[in-house]
Amino acid sequence: MSSKEHSPEKPWRGFYGPNLGAVIELYDQYVEDPNSVDEQTRAHFEKWGPPALEENVSSSNAKETIGADMISAVVGAVRLADYIRAKGHLVSDIQPIWKTDKNSNLLDYDRFNVTEEELKKVPVKLICKDAPPHLKNGLEAIEHLKKVYTQTMAFEFGHVQDEEERNWLRKQVESEAYADELPNKEKKALLERLTSVEGFEKFIHRTFVGQKRFSIEGLDTLVPMLDKAIREVRKEKTDHVMIGMAHRGRLNVLAHTLGKPYKAIFSEFLQAPNKLNAPSEGLGETYTGWTGDVKYHLGADRQISDDKSAQTIVSLANNPSHLEFVSPIVEGYARAAQEDRSSKGAPKQDTTRAYSILIHGDAAFPGQGVVTETLNLSRLNGYHVGGSLHIIANNNIGYTTEMHDSRSTTYASDPAKGFEIPIVHVNADDAEACVRAIKFAVEYRRKFQKDFLIDLIGYRRFGHNEGDEPAVTQPDLYAQIRKHPTVRAIYAKQLEAEQVITAKEAQKLDTDMYNYLLEEYNKVNSDKSEKKYELSPPDFIVDGLPKVKTAVEKEKLVAMNEQLLDWPSSFKPNQKLEKILKRRANAFDGEGNVDWGLAEILAFASILHDGTPVRLSGQDSERGTFAHRHFVLHDRETNETHVPLQTIKDANASFAVYNSPLTEQACVGFEYGYNVFSKETLVLWEAQFGDFVNGAQVMFDQWVSAGRAKWGQKSGLVVLLPHGYEGAGPEHSSGRVERFLSSAAENNWTVANCTSAAQYFHILRRQAKILQKNTVRPLIIMTPKSLLRNQVVASPTSAFTEGEFQPILEEPTLGHDPNAVKRIILCSGKLAIELQDYVNKNDEDWSWVHIIRVEELYPFPRRAIRERLKEFPNLEEVKWVQEEPKNMGAWTFMEPRIREILPSGVPLSYIGRTYRSSPAEGVSNAHKVEQKRIVTESLTRKN
């Protein structure tokens, strides 16, 4: 019942459709048994009688109160209408190959106890409030609903919880507001586009026999759909359209949506020189690294300009064959493009500035977990982009796997329902319906700023790749597909029937397209010279990082520290936390004592002062997993928040920090994408514990480590991985440094394990300084846990106001007499502090040993270590000491590199845990025994 009172009017005044139907059904129930309804409802019926149509609908044949003989018919009509809305998609014409049984009794009238004659007596508006004006009665309204809900477009939005959205969606469908009739000019243009799409595929099929191209045929309408989407969003003066897709149909999208010249694509098939393949101005600008990638993984940018004031860049993201993983990266692109980071405070987001389109596969959409991870980002504060357009390029098969083996749902799109995303299924053979679906989607996003999904249902004309014979595993299906006309042929026949074009004109389009493609091919084929490949990175990458100034004057540090502690007078943080943070006011007294947390926030404050925006995200990153950070303060009385880094006076760029969802894969992808697009921004992703970084392994393997070598895609992403063996077990000990080192080559990233607050400060500032430079690269830092509050890690003021990041550090109390040193211990991270602690606590003669901490594991500090080793003339041995197992940690990476630089005759050996399948002990006492053994053995002098 409505809570709104209309007294003295009847309480159901204004009800219509399903709501009025529910009241009528209740009244029918009341007539049969008054006690079957609740007391309040019974009182309403006793006072007001049955619902009257005249107050709820404006219809000439609805002037009387519903008689008892019509109540059952009205209830049936309303239930039937709702059933059509909910289930019409099950009998819709959305399958090009597998035709739906339109004679199904699913929507038969007798199932709802209503006849055609009775329906004629039911007012139109009772059934369909937004029906077109030409409908005369309930029967026509029902037939109208059947038509709009069971045609080549089918709709699912009953799972959308917001009533305003649901009503808007229903109105769009039932009024057919989205379904504008295309003028003949646009119909001809659509046929021309389909001719280009099909002609391109056929030409490659005939010319490059058996070569992989992952044809779009069967889903040809995807290209005109993208055309329509770009045209629609450009009406909002959108700056960027970001597209993510896999390899199916990618070459066609590159050629037609991105404008990559045909001859450039042909040259990739021929592996010909590319001097003829420079793209036209503003079209199809593609990028490759020095090792490159296959042609159907490459991305491109295209600039579209109607006039000087309206310019849009369309980007297709580079993508490996790991299906769906590009989705969060594209979302990161879009968010970065939408935000203004040029002034202090939080970034200012304008969702009209960028639009993301994600093209999925029907097997991968329900099959890959990164899909739902990405969908979950869609309405989160730190990640939303104002709605993305999802298109499932649904060819009803995954390689050789059929639907019943690839998903447990009715539709490939069903996972989207859990996120309340409206779904339109559309038959890929109906070109005009496909274009209309795009208009529907763009209008929804414009109004509600949420995701929309189009399930584009077609088929795959050939095998998974063109060297594959699909009839081996799907003989019946491919017997049907071979007889099935192409999308272009179907649409050409339609336009001939509508007398928009003649058969001769349609044929001429086809012939002209072939001749043009042949002309472009001959331009490439005429050059027979052999192409030379350069597989080495450019010199500026080989040469390493430039020297940059990272020290900051004491006066600036003190001023920034004061501003960070200058909270609004009315703001009341947690009292215990307030005391802890206020202690920082004295951090620069005397020689100074700056701990890790203060060094971090001062690094960011100084980076903002320099005009570099900062974005940090991760699980619990606002506070910090180990409660050391507190970038977001909470008022203990009002729960309002205060972000000190957004209020410092001298900041010249924005700062953002977000607690991420419990997701690694999509979040790393998002931050990588954000960073790639926003090259001027220091973007950091932090793992809750370093152990969980392998939840994003694909992102590191395919993008972060190799993106530049494959695609020329620069990134300065910073990854913070809490790492260290402290008895917390195999899930809370290791950031898997060995995995990052195993992929370390060609200066593709920096891997560091810092042991002082100043080192952390300098390496963050160095990273910010190299952004937008050719030498930029990702930075992987193994960050501390227990050391966060260890005073040994704190640094004096001079360490921040002087110097720079050092790739190696030496134990300050050792090595003063080089002639006495017999053993040098090389180590990294927390264990170095434990070794130092052991030395300090044991009053012995330690002149025979020296400890060198390797702070930068990659690039390997060859020169620094080699030059230092030369200074110990009586050196007898070098030990690499680590707390990780021998097959993990840095040993495997470091051993051959250290051996290359050892003084002649000096042996290298290992001290640490033995080979293990699990990274750490699960029993605290066992951990302590191992840790003690490693430290003791390292610092025990041999006889």
UniProtKB/Swiss-Prot annotation:
Cellular component terms per the entry's GO annotation: cytosol; oxoglutarate dehydrogenase complex
EC identifiers of the protein: 1.2.4.2
Record SMART domains: Transket_pyr
Keyword Oxidoreductase on entry: yes
GO molecular function terms noted in the UniProt entry: oxoglutarate dehydrogenase (succinyl-transferring) activity; thiamine pyrophosphate binding
Superkingdom to which the source organism belongs: Bacteria
Catalysed reactions listed for this entry: N(6)-[(R)-lipoyl]-L-lysyl-[protein] + 2-oxoglutarate + H(+) = N(6)-[(R)-S(8)-succinyldihydrolipoyl]-L-lysyl-[protein] + CO2
Cofactor: thiamine diphosphate
One GO BP annotation of this record: tricarboxylic acid cycle
Keywords assigned by UniProt, alphabetized: Glycolysis, Oxidoreductase, Thiamine pyrophosphate
Protein purpose: E1 component of the 2-oxoglutarate dehydrogenase (OGDH) complex which catalyzes the decarboxylation of 2-oxoglutarate, the first step in the conversion of 2-oxoglutarate to succinyl-CoA and CO(2).
Subunit structure comment from the entry: Homodimer. Part of the 2-oxoglutarate dehydrogenase (OGDH) complex composed of E1 (2-oxoglutarate dehydrogenase), E2 (dihydrolipoamide succinyltransferase) and E3 (dihydrolipoamide dehydrogenase); the complex contains multiple copies of the three enzymatic components (E1, E2 and E3).
Family: Belongs to the alpha-ketoglutarate dehydrogenase family.
NCBIfam families linked to this entry: 2oxo_dh_E1, PRK09404.1, PRK12270.1
Protein name listed in UniProt: 2-oxoglutarate dehydrogenase E1 component
Lineage: Bacteria, Bacillati, Bacillota, Bacilli, Bacillales
